[in-house]
From Swiss-Prot:
<comment type="similarity">
    <text>Belongs to the NOP5/NOP56 family.</text>
</comment>
<keyword id="KW-0687">Ribonucleoprotein</keyword>
<dbReference type="InterPro" id="IPR002687">
    <property type="entry name" value="Nop_dom"/>
</dbReference>
<dbReference type="GO" id="GO:0032040">
    <property type="term" value="C:small-subunit processome"/>
</dbReference>
<feature type="compositionally biased region" description="Basic and acidic residues">
    <location>
        <begin position="479"/>
        <end position="488"/>
    </location>
</feature>
<comment type="subunit">
    <text>Component of the ribosomal small subunit (SSU) processome.</text>
</comment>
<keyword id="KW-0539">Nucleus</keyword>
<dbReference type="Pfam" id="PF08156">
    <property type="entry name" value="NOP5NT"/>
</dbReference>
<feature type="domain" description="Nop">
    <location>
        <begin position="295"/>
        <end position="413"/>
    </location>
</feature>
<feature type="region of interest" description="Disordered">
    <location>
        <begin position="448"/>
        <end position="497"/>
    </location>
</feature>
<dbReference type="InterPro" id="IPR042239">
    <property type="entry name" value="Nop_C"/>
</dbReference>
<dbReference type="GO" id="GO:0030532">
    <property type="term" value="C:small nuclear ribonucleoprotein complex"/>
</dbReference>
<comment type="function">
    <text>Required for 60S ribosomal subunit synthesis.</text>
</comment>
<dbReference type="GO" id="GO:0005730">
    <property type="term" value="C:nucleolus"/>
</dbReference>
<dbReference type="Pfam" id="PF01798">
    <property type="entry name" value="Nop"/>
</dbReference>
<dbReference type="InterPro" id="IPR012974">
    <property type="entry name" value="NOP58/56_N"/>
</dbReference>
<keyword id="KW-0690">Ribosome biogenesis</keyword>
Length: 497
């Protein structure tokens, strides 16, 4: 049972004396009942010392240290000044809420023995419940204001840990892109049905939705179409004058009905809306590509920006994706098929979101499962490198992509791919050359040594040779032992005769 209790609050550090430690330990149920009543609980613990924080920044610094289990100088000096000196026979017992902080206090101050038992937690819970009444130095409302301010600053610091590498923007961007694709297709279909009453031949000549919308705004009423529009129409259809001329010819002999000015205005405004949505979709796609190259450059280099963004979105974050094993990455997005297969005891799916990768499409029907497993393994490695590396670089992604291409070639031609140890050593060397390390004179990393250590692993042939040598040695030993036994037996026979 602890003799003293350390209470960390938003206002400062408090040290409490535990009155009647033996009686409290014997009556744990009564202590739990007395937690709600301040008149009873005030007799169990008494305030020994209190030290407030200097300002809000100092409180945030101490809160971060406590959350990480670090004993800073401010808390260490407070404990050394207010706790009594321990004797040789008995140490000072201090009740602490956090176990990590307790271990750091033990390692820093030998005279203190920390206690994190259930009874200590109950007493600290009571102090936290009656904190504003036990700390009489504070005026009413100070405790709540300090908690609110510290909570906001602590949460803000955690959220703004790294603004540039925020994967939440990728999740939102890919979701908006998918929704925009659906909306643009729906709006373009309605626009074609609407304008086809007036100019039905245009939808057969121009199939692209964006180009169709631009031509609708350019032509307007088909009765106004003439040969002077040839260059403007050709600019829309990739400078193809034949298509532009066919549009003009079809407009002159179109079988569509006439249209009023009000109807045409609504059609044109709707076509402009489709054009704006398409332009915004292109802009958002470029933003997503740039964001992926900042947040997950290796994953984007390996599997592409769109597929990589969908993997991050489906996993919930880049951190969650990096924690997933390769087998989980392989079937991300195919959960329904997986559970259906498990329920019916059928074949489980071979791939999920990674099916949209170009590597799966290039592989043959027999090798799709193999390449999906290999690709999922490399995606798992790339996501972990992106998540836990301080300086983003595409060196590992380029090497991993080349490994997948070599594996595809191996399935088709049988040419052996590069060994993984050699490829990773090459990527490591590229990463070191691309990242500017502060103090290059002090940092001395020999890539050749790392390659040697990686390549020191014996090959399969070497292992077989070693096994054969061991077998030969064991046979020789057995033959020598048998020969010695025969000699001994012959000697015994001679002595007996």
């Amino acid at each position: 049972m602890a003799d003293y209790l350390l209470y960390e609050s938003a206002t400062g550090y408090s040290l409490f004396d535990v009155v009647g430690a033996d009686q409290i330990a014997a009556k744990t149920k009564e202590v739990q009942l007395s937690l709600q009543d301040i008149s009873k609980f005030g007799k169990v613990v008494q305030l020994r010392s209190f030290i407030p924080f200097k300002n809000a920044a100092h409180a945030l610094e101490n809160a971060n240290d406590i959350s990480e289990g670090v004993l800073n100088d401010f808390l260490k000096n407070f404990l050394e000044l207010n706790l009594p000196k321990a004797s040789k026979k008995k140490k000072v017992s201090l009740g602490v809420q956090d176990k990590n902080l307790a271990t750091s206090i033990k390692s820093e101050i030998d005279a203190i023995e920390c206690d994190t038992s259930e009874l200590t937690q109950d007493l600290l819970r009571g102090i936290r419940f009656h904190g504003d009444k036990l700390l009489k130095q504070l005026s009413p409302g100070d405790f709540e204001r300090a908690q609110l301010g510290l909570g906001h600053s602590y949460s803000r610091a955690k959220v703004k840990f790294n603004v540039n590498r925020n994967d939440n923007m990728i999740i939102q961007a890919i979701a908006i892109l998918d929704q925009l694709d659906k909306d643009i297709n729906t709006f373009a279909m309605r626009m074609k049905e609407w304008y086809s009453w007036h100019f039905p031949e245009l939808s057969k000549i121009v199939g692209d939705n964006y180009k169709y919308a631009v031509i609708v705004t350019l032509v307007g009423d088909k009765t106004t179409i003439n040969d002077e529009m040839l260059h403007d129409l050709a600019a829309v259809v990739d400078d193809d004058k034949d298509i532009a001329q066919s549009i003009i010819n079809a407009g002159k002999v179109s079988m569509g009905q006439d249209i009023s000015e009000i109807d045409l205005e609504n059609i044109l405004s709707f076509a402009e809306r489709v054009i704006k949505l398409s332009n915004y979709r292109k802009q958002l796609h470029n933003y997503l590509v740039q964001k992926m190259n900042v947040v997950a450059p290796n994953l984007a280099e390996l599997i592409g920006e769109m597929v990589g963004a969908r993997l991050i979105s489906h996993a919930g974050s880049l951190t969650n994706l990096s924690k997933c094993p390769a087998s989980t990455v392989q079937i991300l997005g195919a959960e329904k098929a997986l559970f259906r297969a498990l329920k019916t005891r059928g074949n489980t799916p071979k791939y999920g979101i990674i099916y949209h990768s170009s590597f799966i499409g290039k592989a043959g029907a027999k090798n799709k499962g193999r390449i999906s497993r290999f690709l999922a393994n490399k995606c798992s490695i790339a996501s972990r490198i992106d998540n836990f590396s301080d300086a983003p670089t595409t060196a590992f992604g380029q090497v991993l992509r080349r490994q997948v291409e070599e594996r595809l070639n191996f399935f088709d031609t049988g040419v052996a791919p590069t060994r993984n140890s050699i490829a990773m050593a090459e990527a490591y060397e590229k990463a070191l050359s691309s990242v500017n390390i502060d103090g290059d004179e002090e940092v001395d990393i020999d890539v050749e040594e790392t390659v040697e250590t990686i390549s020191e692993k014996p090959s399969k042939k070497e292992k077989k040779d070693k096994k054969e040598k061991k077998k030969e040695k064991s046979k020789k030993k057995r033959s020598a032992d048998d020969a010695s036994e025969e000699v001994k037996k012959s000697k015994k026979k001679k002595k007996s005769h």
